[in-house]
């Protein structure tokens, strides 16, 4: 992963990707996974997202992994939580508080147990194409048999704008999750007033997927 790029974003507080409230896609489409309270949830590249709080209100165990130590510490500090911190290695820390378990370090090496449910809003689209296959292989290994993924992707002409966030078109989604049941829940096409279209993109769409193991 491009560690330095994201570390600099958090260090300089250039975090336009961070939403100050729960993502409406999560609240609208989480029920499509038919989630149960005792099912475990994994959120890759979670940042300090408010989505974690929403999920913890509905599940007993929410696990995240985030490269930036700044983001992980901010998540707990902003909520006045005092987590138990375990140093797992020189580059990996484990933060635990009530329903929350968050690893601070590399997604590819964090020892995360397979979960029933996965929520990926900003992880896959944060990675360049050459990293997405390896990322997805790891993600699939962290999903239990019968598990479900709620995935959010973007679709635009990558030649017209440099990521991140990157474009992950339908054909790539279907290739990455080949062998799994893939259902597109939504495709939201940007209109002429959308900031991305005003900046010159010929098209820009947000897509929501239900992926079942």
From Swiss-Prot:
Transmembrane segments: none annotated. One of its GO terms (biological process) is methylation. Keywords: Cytoplasm, Methyltransferase, S-adenosyl-L-methionine, Transferase. S-adenosyl-L-methionine binds at residues 10, 45, 66, 121. It comes from the Bacteria. GO terms for molecular function: thiopurine S-methyltransferase activity. Its main location: cytoplasm. Pfam families: TPMT (PF05724). Its EC number is 2.1.1.67. One of its GO terms (cellular component) is cytoplasm. It is an enzyme of class 2 (transferase). It catalyses: S-adenosyl-L-methionine + a thiopurine = S-adenosyl-L-homocysteine + a thiopurine S-methylether. It is found in: Cytoplasm. Belongs to the class I-like SAM-binding methyltransferase superfamily. TPMT family. PANTHER family: THIOPURINE S-METHYLTRANSFERASE. This is Thiopurine S-methyltransferase.
């Amino acid at each position: 992963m491009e560690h330095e790029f994201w570390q600099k974003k958090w260090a300089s507080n250039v975090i336009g990707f961070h939403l100050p409230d729960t993502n409406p896609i999560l609240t609208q489409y989480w029920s499509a996974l038919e989630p149960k309270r005792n099912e475990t949830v994994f959120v890759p590249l979670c940042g300090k997202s408010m989505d974690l709080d929403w999920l913890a209100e509905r599940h007993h165990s929410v696990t995240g992994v985030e490269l930036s130590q700044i983001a992980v510490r901010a998540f707990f500090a902003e909520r006045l939580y005092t987590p138990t911190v375990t140093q797992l290695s020189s580059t990996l820390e484990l933060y635990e508080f009530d329903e929350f378990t968050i690893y601070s370090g590399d997604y590819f090496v964090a020892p995360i147990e397979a979960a029933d449910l996965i929520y990926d809003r900003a992880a896959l689209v944060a990675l360049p194409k050459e990293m997405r296959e390896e990322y997805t292989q790891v993600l699939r290994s962290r999903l239990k048999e019968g598990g479900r993924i709620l995935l959010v992707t973007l679709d635009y002409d990558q030649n017209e704008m440099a990521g991140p966030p990157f474009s992950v078109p339908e054909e790539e989604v279907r290739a990455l999750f080949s062998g799994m049941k893939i259902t597109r829940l939504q495709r939201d096409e940007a209109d002429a007033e959308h900031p991305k279209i005003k900046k010159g993109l010929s098209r820009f769409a947000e897509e929501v997927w239900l992926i079942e193991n």
